[in-house]
Amino acid sequence: MIRAVLLLLATAIAAPPATLGVDPFYAKYLDAGGIPILSSAMAPDEALAAAHDIVADMLAARPDLHAWLVQQRYRVAVMAADETTTDLPEQRGWTRPAATDPRLTRCERLHYAERIGRLTDRQYWDARARGMAGPLTSAAAENLLAGPRDRYHGENIFVHEFAHDVLAAIRAADGRLYARVDAAYRQTLAAQRWQGEYASTTVDEYWAVGTQFWFNSGRIATFDTVHVLSDTDLTRYDPALAVTLRAAYGDRHHLLADRFWDSPDRVPPGPLPRYTAEVC
């Protein structure tokens, strides 16, 4: 049934309208309630349809946030498996982050020279990212479709990246809710939750990782005897975060077009490590 809906959506794909004023790189277009879903001719139609449905479902409970993203001209670009982050016209000139960039993880800061400093700008971004948030949010077709070349197999990276956009809308359009998200993040740091995990890096990553678990679409996180894999686990482990996620997404925990929803691939084979945080 879900595949049939995606295939039906795919038949609505057309060339981008001239009014969008996009680069000729973009040959395909779907409209997600005013948020353009774009790609080159190389991306499969079904991947655009999946991105469309995920956007619609993540914003369903908050039309005000949807309206803000439309007003700010947010758009989504789906990369084909053979395309890279810097193939996208808006990202061709991206440079590497500096060693002082607050978005770097502690391991990236510790090993900056080896992991980042020795690479060209293009080498860094093409190795680092198969999806980015922002006014142009990108997604990888192979991840949206859980394909064989998916380097992030086991989690939906687009759910994570679009969650950043949702938080940007909250920050601008619902200051009270954003204050609650920020307070939850400060509380979680003080309580030493998510220690060493990507969620501890910034309030933005805290929200995006939490969103993945809210929608049962993130790789398992382990903290000794505590495991976080589902929305139920998340609510138990970080109730303050769960309350704010509910305020944005309602009680929905399943994005129908998400291939990794409740997937066994979210748990790696073999014995689980005591802690999934990177050791550096």
Predicted regions, residues:
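Acidic/His-rich structured neighborhood in mature extracellular/periplasmic domains
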Residues: 25, 32-35, 44-186, 224-227
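A very general structural signal that marks isolated residues within well-ordered alpha-helical segments
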Residues: 6-7, 61, 214
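Metalloprotease/metallohydrolase-associated module, dominated by Zn2+-dependent proteases
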Residues: 21-24, 38, 94-103, 110-140, ...
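Intrinsic disorder/low-complexity segments
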Residues: 10, 14, 121-124
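Short N-terminal segments immediately surrounding and downstream of signal-peptide cleavage
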Residues: 16-31
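Sec-dependent N-terminal signal peptides
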Residues: 2-12
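Short amphipathic alpha-helical segments with coiled-coil-like heptad repeat character
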Residues: 3, 65, 216-219
